[in-house]
């Protein structure tokens, strides 16, 4: 496995192991009603939480939460820590990379340009909501500027910009 992917897509492998462990714990527990919602990204987790309705049964919530996470596409904008190749593209240390659910979506030198290209690769005709969670290394001004550009490019989508405060990732993007 490419060490570069240990940040980003490589995290999905770790989360799959966590899901397996959670399901195993559920199988071993007889006196509690445990439901595992198999989220693999932070945006999926947020969508699952928003889908939860306290008045509904556990089974209804499980169905709604699981359906909700199926609609989420996740993107992450970060930087390369070393020279490498990802998806047949040459990456140099310090390059800005846009990673999606299934691989590299964009690479370049400018954070906002790579973020825009990443989002463009994620949005389709069914997209309704674009959420941008900017990290500790992206200014509020840059995040708001990105949000405005995305609103102009996709007027039929709702665009939200929120401070996520995450390290390493300039922004994490959710498209639903």
Per-segment meaning from a language model:
Residues 14-18, 32-44, 51-55, 134-139, ...:
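Short, ordered loop/turn segments at secondary-structure junctions
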Residues 7, 30-33, 92-94, 100-101, ...:
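Short coil/turn connectors at secondary-structure junctions
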Residues 25, 42-113, 119:
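Internal, active-site/partner-interface "lid" segment
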Residues 12, 130, 156-158, 162-166, ...:
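Active-site loops and adjacent core secondary-structure elements that bind or stabilize anionic groups
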Residues 2-9, 13:
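Single conserved hydrophobic/aromatic residue that forms the stacking wall/gate
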Residues 91-112, 120, 124-147, 172-176:
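Glycine-rich phosphate/diphosphate-binding loops and the adjacent beta-loop-alpha structural elements
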Residues 1, 34-36, 148-151, 157-161:
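Polyanionic, low-complexity intrinsically disordered segments
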Residues 17-31, 142-147:
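Short Gly/Thr/Asp-enriched flexible loops that form oxyanion-binding sites at enzyme active sites
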């Amino acid at each position: 496995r490419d060490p570069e992917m240990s940040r980003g897509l490589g995290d999905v492998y770790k989360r799959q192991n966590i899901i397996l462990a959670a399901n195993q714990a559920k199988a071993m527990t007889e006196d509690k009603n445990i439901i595992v919602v198999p989220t693999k990204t932070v945006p999926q987790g947020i969508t699952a939480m928003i889908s939860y309705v306290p008045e509904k049964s556990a089974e209804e919530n499980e169905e709604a939460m699981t359906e909700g996470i199926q609609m989420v596409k996740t993107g992450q904008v970060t930087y390369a820590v070393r020279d490498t190749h990802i998806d047949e593209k040459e990456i140099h240390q310090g390059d800005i990379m846009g990673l999606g659910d299934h691989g590299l979506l964009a690479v370049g030198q400018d954070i906002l340009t790579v973020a825009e290209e990443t989002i463009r690769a994620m949005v389709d005709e069914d997209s309704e909501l674009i959420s941008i969670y900017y990290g500790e290394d992206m200014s509020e001004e840059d995040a708001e500027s990105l949000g405005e550009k995305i609103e102009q490019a996709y007027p039929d989508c709702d665009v939200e910009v929120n401070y996520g405060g995450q390290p390493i990732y300039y922004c994490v993007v959710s498209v639903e």
